[in-house]
């Protein structure tokens, strides 16, 4: 049975990738359908109740700069905000928010339900309709067919999902939700490489059974940060504390004693887990010399007693879980409200994707989120936005777009996945970006909002606020460069007490700000130098642009050299056996990866600069040299 309407874009799945994908396509004017197995769980935080962190916060800011919903929802749901690495340079500073699960879900659902061009329908998808390597629609579990030339799959952990607690296991997409078996079987028929990954979650604890007096309190920052460039502290709900405790030798003994019933260590789980978010049993095994591990005690919301003990993700049997929890200081009498578990699921090799996140095998079929081998809400949301945007561009007959590695962490994420693939759940870190001085949280809007406006992702309100901010930054920089103070100036008496060494020659306000002992706020408080900018975001930009101008310029020069051949396109139909001079190893790797550009090819392990030179010569001889968009 066919549904009576045809859609421009269909998004399957309503998690963090699916919601951003659907919103992006709809914002760009595409008639969009979001299909979910349960409308009530749209925007659900399935694992930890937090958004942001090192690398991840950068992605959230980029989603926000492109008009996405994640940062806005976090500002309305965040019950504790902190700036991580605040004592370090601006490139690695990151915002992290503890979020109220219910408030976050409610805000996302409110944004979805009020988005023009977006229809939401509750049905699980069992099948894809593909004709001549082109997707033309989907079929739901009740046999209802929806037609569309572009489909974005954001299936999370649902594809052939299997939940493990001890040696017991059962099929599930996550606790309380059914898996997507039929769709997983259909996808395995496609010419896309498939694998298995696993992730896990800790047991949830009843706050009424925890003795917080034995733990270290961790308060949020003051003044409070905001996540969205459109955000305001007034959006934040009540702020509360988290706590810190630790495992001990007794905890470790209990865990070691239960490893014979661990699905990870008995061979029941085949999927590979996240390296940077290991289970507690994995920590004990891998770091046997450590006598304790830190645990963050995180409230799940303002109106619930559930506590998320971040650091003890586990799939051990329930009796072992209860014993290990009660061995931890402050949790001697703790009661578990939900057991921890591991979940195995299908993912597809992201090397089989274009950097638009469209599959190379099926036109119009896009993948985003954990289906591509990533882990984390932020990584999923960023991919979802990109996939939804490119699905809309394709329907409009326009070229796909993806930021380069020097333009966004989103560009780093997609390039890493589509070029190198992944054998384990991929998460973002600032260390993955070679140009991180330019890819800061604070300038995500300056990097991306103009492009977002051009693409149709950014609305009038965001554009007006951004334009005003940009103008104020430029005017203030001009003022600082154009105003000078000399040793005999009346301003000197107020200025010199704030300087390590008094000025001996005429200096601009910009030069004074560049001094290590000076910051923008301090300079503006000195009589004759203010009043300065009231907008803290704009003021921060002025300070960073002045103080780091030399470093930023040098990094930009590096980028200009690197991008010369970065976007030189490689035909996907090119058989590298036909390129004379390449080694058998290089031929095999290039034919296996099928890179889209010279830049992608150069980042494949084992591809030498000499091989790249041979490729460029071959392309030139054949008249195939072209720059991709």
UniProtKB/Swiss-Prot annotation:
<dbReference type="InterPro" id="IPR026904">
    <property type="entry name" value="MnmG_C"/>
</dbReference>
<dbReference type="GO" id="GO:0050660">
    <property type="term" value="F:flavin adenine dinucleotide binding"/>
</dbReference>
<comment type="similarity">
    <text>Belongs to the MnmG family.</text>
</comment>
<keyword id="KW-0963">Cytoplasm</keyword>
<keyword id="KW-0819">tRNA processing</keyword>
<feature type="binding site">
    <location>
        <begin position="273"/>
        <end position="287"/>
    </location>
    <ligand>
        <name>NAD(+)</name>
    </ligand>
</feature>
<dbReference type="InterPro" id="IPR002218">
    <property type="entry name" value="MnmG-rel"/>
</dbReference>
<dbReference type="Pfam" id="PF13932">
    <property type="entry name" value="SAM_GIDA_C"/>
</dbReference>
<dbReference type="GO" id="GO:0005829">
    <property type="term" value="C:cytosol"/>
</dbReference>
<dbReference type="InterPro" id="IPR036188">
    <property type="entry name" value="FAD/NAD-bd_sf"/>
</dbReference>
<dbReference type="GO" id="GO:0002098">
    <property type="term" value="P:tRNA wobble uridine modification"/>
</dbReference>
<dbReference type="InterPro" id="IPR020595">
    <property type="entry name" value="MnmG-rel_CS"/>
</dbReference>
<dbReference type="Pfam" id="PF01134">
    <property type="entry name" value="GIDA"/>
</dbReference>
<dbReference type="GO" id="GO:0030488">
    <property type="term" value="P:tRNA methylation"/>
</dbReference>
<dbReference type="InterPro" id="IPR040131">
    <property type="entry name" value="MnmG_N"/>
</dbReference>
<keyword id="KW-0274">FAD</keyword>
<dbReference type="Pfam" id="PF21680">
    <property type="entry name" value="GIDA_C_1st"/>
</dbReference>
<feature type="binding site">
    <location>
        <begin position="13"/>
        <end position="18"/>
    </location>
    <ligand>
        <name>FAD</name>
    </ligand>
</feature>
<dbReference type="InterPro" id="IPR049312">
    <property type="entry name" value="GIDA_C_N"/>
</dbReference>
<comment type="function">
    <text>NAD-binding protein involved in the addition of a carboxymethylaminomethyl (cmnm) group at the wobble position (U34) of certain tRNAs, forming tRNA-cmnm(5)s(2)U34.</text>
</comment>
<dbReference type="InterPro" id="IPR004416">
    <property type="entry name" value="MnmG"/>
</dbReference>
<protein>
    <recommendedName>
        <fullName>tRNA uridine 5-carboxymethylaminomethyl modification enzyme MnmG</fullName>
    </recommendedName>
</protein>
<keyword id="KW-0285">Flavoprotein</keyword>
<comment type="subunit">
    <text>Homodimer. Heterotetramer of two MnmE and two MnmG subunits.</text>
</comment>
<keyword id="KW-0520">NAD</keyword>
<dbReference type="InterPro" id="IPR047001">
    <property type="entry name" value="MnmG_C_subdom"/>
</dbReference>
<dbReference type="InterPro" id="IPR044920">
    <property type="entry name" value="MnmG_C_subdom_sf"/>
</dbReference>
């Amino acid at each position: 049975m066919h549904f009576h309407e045809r859609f421009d874009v269909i998004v399957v799945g309503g998690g963090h990738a699916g919601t951003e994908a659907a919103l992006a396509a709809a914002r760009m004017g595409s008639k969009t359908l979001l299909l979910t197995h349960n409308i009530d769980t749209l925007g659900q935080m399935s694992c930890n109740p937090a958004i942001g962190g090192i690398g991840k916060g950068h992605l959230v800011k980029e989603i926000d700069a492109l008009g996405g919903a994640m940062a806005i929802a976090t500002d309305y749901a965040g019950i504790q905000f902190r700036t991580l690495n605040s004592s370090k340079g601006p490139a690695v500073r990151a915002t992290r928010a503890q979020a109220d699960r219910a408030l976050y879900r409610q805000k996302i659902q409110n944004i979805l339900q009020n988005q023009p061009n977006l229809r939401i329908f509750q049905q699980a998808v069992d099948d894809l309709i593909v004709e001549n390597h082109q997707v033309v629609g989907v079929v739901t579990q009740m046999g209802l067919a929806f037609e569309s030339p572009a489909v974005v799959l954001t299936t999370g952990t649902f594809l052939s999902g299997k939940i493990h607690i001890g040696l017991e296991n059962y099929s599930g997409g996550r606790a309380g939700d059914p898996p997507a078996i039929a769709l997983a079987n259909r996808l395995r028929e496609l010419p896309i490489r498939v694998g298995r990954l696993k992730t896990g979650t800790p047991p949830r604890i009843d706050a009424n059974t925890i003795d917080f007096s034995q733990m270290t309190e961790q308060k949020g920052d003051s003044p409070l940060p905001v996540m969205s460039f459109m955000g305001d502290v007034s959006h934040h709900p009540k702020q509360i504390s988290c706590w810190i405790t630790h495992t001990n030798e007794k905890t470790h003994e209990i865990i070691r004693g239960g490893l014979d019933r661990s699905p990870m260590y008995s061979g029941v789980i085949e999927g590979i887990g996240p390296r940077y978010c290991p289970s507690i049993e994995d920590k004990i095994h891998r770091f046997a010399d450590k006598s304790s591990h830190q645990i963050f005690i995180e409230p799940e919301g303002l109106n619930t007693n559930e506590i998320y003990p971040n650091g003890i993700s586990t799939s051990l049997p329930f009796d072992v879980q209860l014993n290990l929890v009660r061995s931890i200081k402050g949790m001697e009498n703790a009661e578990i409200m939900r057991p921890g578990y591991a979940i195995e699921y299908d993912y597809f090799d992201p090397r089989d994707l274009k950097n638009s996140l469209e599959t190379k095998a099926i036109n119009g079929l896009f993948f985003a989120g954990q289906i591509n081998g990533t882990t984390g809400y932020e990584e999923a949301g960023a991919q979802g936005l990109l996939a939804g945007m490119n699905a809309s561009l394709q329907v409009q007959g326009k070229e796909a777009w993806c930021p380069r590695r020097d333009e966004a962490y989103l560009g780093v994420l997609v390039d890493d996945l589509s070029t190198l693939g992944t054998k384990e759940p991929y998460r973002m870190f600032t260390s993955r970006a070679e140009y991180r001085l330019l890819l800061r949280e604070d300038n995500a809007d300056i990097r991306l909002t103009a492009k977002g406006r051009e693409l149709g992702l950014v609305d009038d309100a965001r554009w007006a606020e951004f334009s005003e901010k940009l103008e104020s930054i430029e005017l203030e920089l001009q003022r600082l460069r154009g105003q000078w103070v000399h040793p005999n100036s009346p301003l000197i008496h107020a200025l010199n007490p704030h300087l390590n060494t008094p000025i001996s020659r005429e200096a601009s306000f910009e030069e004074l700000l560049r001094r290590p002992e000076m910051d923008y706020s301090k300079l503006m408080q000195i009589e004759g130098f203010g009043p300065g900018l009231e907008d803290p975001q704009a003021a921060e930009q002025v300070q960073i642009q002045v103080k780091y101008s030399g470093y930023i310029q040098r990094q930009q020069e590096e980028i200009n050299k690197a991008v010369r051949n970065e976007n030189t396109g490689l035909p996907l139909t090119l058989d590298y056996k036909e390129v004379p001079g390449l080694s058998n190893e290089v031929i095999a790797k290039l034919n296996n990866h099928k890179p889209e550009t010279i830049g992608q090819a150069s980042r494949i392990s084992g591809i030498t600069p000499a091989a790249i030179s041979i490729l460029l010569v071959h392309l030139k001889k054949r008249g195939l040299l072209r720059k991709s968009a």
